[in-house]
Amino acid sequence: MQLRNPELHLGCALALRFLALVSWDIPGARALDNGLARTPTMGWLHWERFMCNLDCQEEPDSCISEKLFMEMAELMVSEGWKDAGYEYLCIDDCWMAPQRDSEGRLQADPQRFPHGIRQLANYVHSKGLKLGIYADVGNKTCAGFPGSFGYYDIDAQTFADWGVDLLKFDGCYCDSLENLADGYKHMSLALNRTGRSIVYSCEWPLYMWPFQKPNYTEIRQYCNHWRNFADIDDSWKSIKSILDWTSFNQERIVDVAGPGGWNDPDMLVIGNFGLSWNQQVTQMALWAIMAAPLFMSNDLRHISPQAKALLQDKDVIAINQDPLGKQGYQLRQGDNFEVWERPLSGLAWAVAMINRQEIGGPRSYTIAVASLGKGVACNPACFITQLLPVKRKLGFYEWTSRLRSHINPTGTVLLQLENTMQMSLKDLL
């Protein structure tokens, strides 16, 4: 989808100011003391693939309805997605009824969700999965449904009562940056006060960047992950723009990420229509390097075996979920090549080499292994395994060695480097 328009509406300012004042004075209220998202969250989210399709009469298989989510839940279990780590089934915008109920609570659209969110959550939980839901900090959601402004506490409690496990909180329709920040903080505190473990996914910095640089130290205190840049769409142009933005701003955003709080470059669009195979490999590899939340947005009923195998690749997922929790970064670029690297636990490193050229055939790229992993990854030597586009063992490399790879246009080679000193210690143990 296009970047959701953060249209500014008057009317929330005074009430938000009051809500902010009373919430900060509550004794013992602590922001995001929830112990969640110790590794990047994984799951499925409807937006990029299904958007805001409300026409269940003409398109019953792709409209936003309980049927869609129940079918996805079934497939997440039966087709190995849950076992691979994808545990959150997440509803995005357009699930709500046009108005709140008589007691001011959000309610699901009665035609598309006739049994309500609580029963859907029960079904999802019965599958061993967790349920995510969507709301907005302002007067309306980005699609025009009721927003949470003025209702932060009641909405947080409603989600907890329903058994929701994750909240994606968008940033449309609020009237100032100050009120935007107050709203995100208030909802974080409100979720904590419910006593239920609810992952808090924010879009706070996304709506700040056009006007001022976000304070990521503060954002991390309130959010489990946060969107920074424009919404992804099913195109190579979109993937490139996200990587370019991330590398340009990496000095500001990389170090703040870690267990409990992650930069979110948006959904995985692997298995859809717009990316070539090599471009899908690039997205999977770089989302692992960036320690990104892995939220697929695709149709699990109609996904190719190749895309499924890529999304369920246990070695790549292990890099994404590495317990050290350090986000990777771009090491170098030039001649249409980029090298990204990420430190891993056990003195290991992940390295991704991208061929950004969009013409011609595969190109060779050679790099000194001494330049990788801050000079220590292969000191005195390392064992290198290629994980993508196909897995193969490349063998031992000394610190003085040079590594040569052939990379397809718009494709990526993903490597794992294991220091031989650490490998010897493992063997001894």
UniProtKB/Swiss-Prot annotation:
Describe the effect of R342Q: In FD; severe
Mutating A352G: what's the consequence?
In FD; uncertain significance; decreased enzyme activity
Which residues carry out catalysis? D170 (nucleophile), D231 (proton donor)
Mutating I253T has which effect? In FD; uncertain significance; decreased enzyme activity
Signal peptide span: 1-31
Disulfide bond residue pairs = C52-C94, C56-C63, C142-C172, C202-C223, C378-C382
**Chain sites annotated for binding substrate:** E203, W204, P205, L206, Y207
Effect of mutating W204R: In FD; loss of enzyme activity
Superkingdom is Eukaryota
Q: Which disease is it linked to?
A: Fabry disease: Rare X-linked sphingolipidosis disease where glycolipid accumulates in many tissues. The disease consists of an inborn error of glycosphingolipid catabolism. FD patients show systemic accumulation of globotriaosylceramide (Gb3) and related glycosphingolipids in the plasma and cellular lysosomes throughout the body. Clinical recognition in males results from characteristic skin lesions (angiokeratomas) over the lower trunk. Patients may show ocular deposits, febrile episodes, and burning pain in the extremities.
Q: What is this protein called?
A: Alpha-galactosidase A
